[in-house]
Amino acid sequence: MGLIDFLRNKTKTAETAKNRLQIIIAQERTQRGGPDYLPLLQRELLEVIKKYVKIDADAVKVDLIKDGANDVLDISVALPDDSER
């Protein structure tokens, strides 16, 4: 019976892979320090600004700054000179 019990009690590989992936995702989120929506927010802000002003993709920067108990959303937009608009 020892061999049958050994084979029967095995953790499924899909479950193991899922658990490992969840750990990796949690570690990456804590290392980044920011929520997942920041890249999407940056792209959407860029699209809205492009409707009115011609700017490059790297002209919009979005950062989340932790200031004690508060989170501050820092949005920086580098606008072109008047001649380039």
Curated annotation (Swiss-Prot):
It holds the Pfam family MinE. The keyword Cell membrane does not apply. GO terms for biological process: cell division; regulation of division septum assembly. InterPro entries: MinE (IPR005527), MinE_sf (IPR036707). The keyword Cell cycle applies. Keywords: Cell cycle, Cell division. Prevents the cell division inhibition by proteins MinC and MinD at internal division sites while permitting inhibition at polar sites. This ensures cell division at the proper site by restricting the formation of a division septum at the midpoint of the long axis of the cell. Belongs to the MinE family. This is Cell division topological specificity factor. It comes from Xylella fastidiosa (strain Temecula1 / ATCC 700964).
